[in-house]
Amino acid sequence: MTSVGTTLIVKPANNSGGSDGNIKNNNNNNNNNNNNNNNNNNSNSGNNSNNNSFIDDQVLHTGYLTKQGGRIQNWKIRWFVLKRGTLSYYLSPINWEYTKPRGVIYLTKKTELKEVDHRNRRHCFAVNPNYISENQSIIQQQQNQPILRSSSDSVNNNNNNNNNNNNNNNNNNNNNNNNNNNNNNNNNNNNNNNNNNNNNNNNNNSKLYPNSTRIYLISAQTVFDKSKWIEMIKLAISSDNSQDSKLKRANHQLEKVKDLVFSNRKGSIPTFPSLLNRTIATESLNDLIKVHLSKKRFYFYHDNLTLPALSYIDSESPVNLQEIHHQHLILLQQQKEELNKKLKKIQQQNNIGGGGSGSNIANSANKINNKNNDKINGVGSGEDKNNNKGGGGDNNSQSSSSSVSPTTVSPSVSPLSSSPTKPPIILSKKPLPTPPRNISTSDNGSGTDSPFYNSAITRLPLISTSVGMVGPNGMVNITSMNTTTTTTTTTTTTAPTTTNTNTNIKPLPGIQQNKLQLIQNKDGGGGGGGVLKRTNPLLSTSAPSMAYNQLVANSGIIHKHQPKIVVFHLVRDSFQISNIGGCSFNFEILSPFDPNFTLNFIPSSGTIQKGDSLTVLVELMAYNHIETDIYSTLHIIGGMEFTLFCRIETDPYLPLFLKSCAGSVLPLEKQMKMESFMKKNPTMVKSIQELAHTLILDGRNIIPLHLSNNININNNNNNGGGGSGYNIGGGSNNSIGGSGSNNNSNVNISNGWNIENSNRRNSGGCLNLVGGSGGGGLINNNINNNNNNNNNNNNNNNNNNNNNNNNNNNNNNNNNNNNNNNNNNNNNNNNNGSGLLSSSPLITISNQNTPTPQARVKLSKYILNFQRNQKKNSVGDVESVKIYQLLTDKFLISNSGSADASFQFHFPSRGKKNDLFSLSLVPTNGTVSKGEWFYIKSTLTVFVETEISEMIQLIINQREVHHILITVKCENIHPGNKEIDLEKEVVLHERLGTGATGDIYRGLISQDNLNRHISNQDSSGSNSSGSGSGHNWLIARNPSNDIINKDAIIGSGPQIIVAVKKLHPLADPSPEMIQDFYNEVRVLSMFNHPNVVKYVGGCTKIANWSIVMEYVPGGNLMDVLANPVLVIPYKLVLRMALDIAKGLHYLHSLGILHLDMKSPNLLVSSLSTSAKVNIKVADFNTCINRSRITAGFFNRHTGSGDNNKVEKDSKKGTTLWMAPEVIRGAMYSEKCDVYSFAIIMWEMVTRKLPYSHIAFNCEVEDQVLKGLRPPIPMHCNKNYTDLMEQCWDDDPENRPYFDTIIHSISKMIESNDITEQKAKASFKGLRRTQSNSTLNLLQVQNNNNNSNNNNNNNNNNNNNNSNSNLNNCNNSSPNLGTNSANNDSGVSVLQTCSDIGVGSTGTNSGTSGTNSGFDSPVIVTKDYHLISNLQKLDLHSNDGSDTNGSQIGFKSDINSKKSSLEVHSKHKSKRFSYDGGSSRASINTLNNDSNLPFKFSPPSTPQSSFLQLKKLDKELKSNLESNAGTKHSFIRYKPSFTNVTSAKSKLNLNNNNNN
């Protein structure tokens, strides 16, 4: 006979048929359960492990690892298998169970495990078994314990213990596989076996370990894999595998269960039937009962999950059901003690009740039993609907329970569903198949579709007969027996349990009922107690139906991993109970109580006929994040018990989102946890927030009533003193109502969930307690303890719908209230005898008749990464975001609800991180009307190189919160960009210039600080100074004799002068200014070219924007050209033009357009013709990338009349240098810079500003569009003029590219060098043969330029004027007058003449009109130094000179062997209009873009091909060879500058890199 309260839990056997894990408590001596595994472990007797295969052969962990060899120190990959006590490795995982391992590492208590670092191997750990030390311990134990006695402990409670002990010993020794009834034989076998195998059974170590000192070095693949292996190996080492410890541990756990069952029964919490509170009556065991369960482990799958990413985890459930989880038992014990304390605290209150009976809302036929039968007259008496009179204490408890027929299931409602009730049904006798799982089914349109996905919700379908019945309409109705345990408790006695079958339950609208109802009487209670009803307010008007509505016959696919439970989502599984015995039996399923979840078995009790099967549905819903194991008990009345196991591991993040999205302020730790989840899982942010908001709007985010931790007592005076009562396990605002005479003690038990929201909603957590009749009435306890209807706002109707079941007609089951009961205080005067406890949710629940309008706001995305408009690189990846880049993004906000919604953005980090980024959202607040949608535009600018991951909140109607994640990783403007702390690293001094956006300062930076910002390429010396020394520009700029205090500079080493462009400080810069600064820094950091100004670094801090550049001492080109003291020879002009062309060609090769090319943006590095670099291009704030240029980039025309004016913002550059297409507003191209280069060429020739006679820029633009160009000087070289005219052609297609321009200028420089070489060679010959101090210049024929010599017919007339006093050549310069018969005559550029003899008068060709003589005299000094062999050409202008002629003067310095030429031009040319057309041939190239910035392709046009130019070079070379034999050769000078005045001025070393 089984004793009362004993729970038998036996490990299931591995047999496929028969009773799977059945424990038979019969009177016979059947010991099959002990002998099922005898033959399974014979092969493991020598492996130092226990013979229990179900435990010892359990594989803890497997995987590939790399192991170092023992003899040969090589590394090999092996398949490792970890079991308790052993770590084996195989060649491969294929059939490793049937193959011999390559090696075994025995894990003992002394095995050491640690992480090591081994050479190049990563993720290594070492295993040191310590076999020698373990063997010594074994030998010592064998000496201390010579004989091992088998354990006499047994889990089985059979009548023949001798057989059990014998069989257990046989199992240990593997000697007897037969179940013999002869005890003596078994005992003899046991003794012999124990004596023979004494050493083999000592501490599960049958043999000594090998005498080896080897340390196994193992390497894992990843650091996570290594941590997992170390953890599992430690677990295998720490586990005790001995049989004694197993039996001891099992008995210890059994005692724990017994203690939980029998101890403190009086104070146990009333709840569902479970191991903690059930009372098992004396039963007679029936040996004909045989039960088979389809499964005893449950893996729940979601019924209506809309977030598949949360559904599965890699988690394994415990295998051994016999070993109940120790921590779980401790947790249950702690919960039990905690709840007992709460009950004792409540019981200490004196609740002196008046008369009146209390009954529950279920309208059961129960009369409340006054255990003491004390007739205490109450304040009043009354009766309920069932005529249960209160008062007088004559109320006797009677329970009427319906008889249960065989194979009959009493119908009820699932606590987690709202299915209608049905009459009792008779199950079919045919066994049912296992229900399929994890099959996607479509919805029937009952409001269960996901509001965010068009696809149907994945459900777990069940076959209809598996849940008992199919209704007439084909709908599946899940039924269960509602087992109600009613305990009437006094201070001294405990009444036995009674089972009531409620068949007339009609749940309240929107409230899902629970099964347990408790009626409790307090001392002094007059006739009746209050009513305790535990409800589960999973209120949802659009929640999916919990009953399955589709028949599925196919078998489902079972997921390999443990499914994860999502809070507030129903999960289900099922199993079958089959009666394979000879009689019918009754069963009941007992589930544990836990405040964090609800586990229901449907049906939870019933009768199964012989040969029939019943499918039991298991429903689970979790309310918080938990990770635990649940052990339930299936009790077969008169038979046996089974342990049912399920693993719960919930998602830890959805509860956080439910609280935060509902408006609750999370603790800092949980807030960081939620934000960390959003940052690590950006793809799930949208889904999980939509799921949370759906649960909130549906009212499913309310914590159930039984989640109670804190107790708050509030006393309210109400009319009447009904029966005392309280509610256990309340939710957010639940009252435990006790009643005294005219004094109701209301105790609020809650865990503090969402108190803030409850207060904001006033009566959102309203509880109404109805006391007994007589003095009892309606106790309406709001959160504010206020019965004023004015504070209930919109929730009054909902509370009345849920709680107004007490009408004046005393009808308990009246769900449809005709009276709205707007005044809750009037309900307190009703003498209802029924006790009612109900709850309303925090979120407004719509009335079924007149639903309350709700707003449903949705966002198109919850993550803003600002990469919508980012370009993609060649690989296809999106380019990284740069600092100071204006980033834009947008998202859609819509309202699909029935009411308007107000919204407002909240920036938690605003004010804290303003120096990092600037974020704006437009609009920031407003209203979204129902059915309306629009875009929210967001702009972001990041100021520093960082990774931003910030949260902003969108608040809807001041109660819903949407969290939007902003994640941007900003890199520096360019890899070459260096951030400089301007205040610490640079010392600013005098201002060099000013501009529209900022000022230019001269500063000093130390060499050490500069080296940290300059790359090796910048310091390679390719950019030499103007002195021609070839050293680094940093060294050349070292101010060794500077008067600046060097101690003021932070850093050591020599100090370097730099130029600092500091922008005007602005507190709130506009986006345009930010982009201009960003653009200039970005472009400068990309460049590395000798003709582009060097970029040192930049300071990108707000209000301290600055750019540190190379200091160029010569100033800008415009100031140099305007300085009259500076002498600029023609050779220098060509070299400066070549430098400018190279710099612009480099920009164009990178796809950069300057668009503001002008002389103020060109810095002069040197004026020496021997310098490698003369000009550097600067000022790049208007640069744009060619790839960003589109037709829509510009505003074409405003359409205002005939002028076709263009918007000012669409034009970049300065008017004087602006190309016609830019003025028209056409699309930019490289030809815009080519036009500006032509204007600069004209500036260098004339040393004037263009269009100086026009006052207004608008007039300049009109004239340029009409074809006006600056006048070309008459003395300018033809090739130079042709190139200049080509570059400023009105049609951009006719303008050459810069590679062609570079080639043309290079040829001009080569031609000029050849001319100089000829001049030097000619005058050396004159110096050897001529002894006179003067030389009469003769007319010679010019072979190179015959078209421009018509103006030089009268040059020989001036020979007599060449007599000058050479003795005063150091102080004065002779004037050589040249009379020109033509006003257009001028002095041409240096050109080579043909060879003639000395004294030759030349030849004049009258027919051709060409003067073949030399134009101007050449003076030779006594020491035969040619005056024209000059190194410096000084050009001055004489405005008062005569216009009919020109004077040429020479200054000669004999001592320094240097001479200069002064040209005084009296000719003033008139301006003329130029229509852009030219009859001269232009030079173009077929290749528009040059890939190499320093290798230029020659022109290949038919007009002037490379072969023609090469032919010209051959002719020049032949002329030089023919002139080598002559005695004299002459050159003629054509000065190339006019109108230059002589003045004295100092050298202005200003660096004006501004506009």
Curated annotation (Swiss-Prot):
The active site is at D1156. Keywords: ATP-binding, Kinase, Nucleotide-binding, Serine/threonine-protein kinase, Transferase. One of its GO terms (biological process) is signal transduction. It catalyses: L-seryl-[protein] + ATP = O-phospho-L-seryl-[protein] + ADP + H(+); L-threonyl-[protein] + ATP = O-phospho-L-threonyl-[protein] + ADP + H(+). Residues 58-238 form the PH domain. Residues 986-1309 form the Protein kinase domain. The keyword Ribosomal protein does not apply. Residues 1-54, 138-208, 342-452, 486-508, 781-850, 1012-1031, 1340-1383, 1457-1480 are annotated as: Disordered. One of its GO terms (cellular component) is cytoplasm. InterPro entries: Kinase-like_dom_sf (IPR011009), PH-like_dom_sf (IPR011993), PH_domain (IPR001849), Prot_kinase_dom (IPR000719), Ser-Thr/Tyr_kinase_cat_dom (IPR001245), Ser/Thr_kinase_AS (IPR008271), Ser/Thr_Kinases-Pseudokinases (IPR051681). Residues 437-452, 833-850 have a biased composition (Polar residues). ATP binds at L992, G993, T994, G995, A996, T997, G998, D999, I1000, K1061. Residues 14-53, 138-205, 359-378, 395-431, 486-504, 781-832, 1340-1376 have a biased composition (Low complexity). GO terms for molecular function: ATP binding; protein kinase activity; protein serine kinase activity; protein serine/threonine kinase activity. Its EC number is 2.7.11.1. It comes from the Eukaryota. Pfam families: PH (PF00169), PK_Tyr_Ser-Thr (PF07714). PANTHER family: MITOGEN-ACTIVATED PROTEIN KINASE KINASE KINASE 20, SERINE/THREONINE-PROTEIN KINASE TNNI3K-RELATED. Belongs to the protein kinase superfamily. TKL Ser/Thr protein kinase family. This is Probable serine/threonine-protein kinase DDB_G0276181.
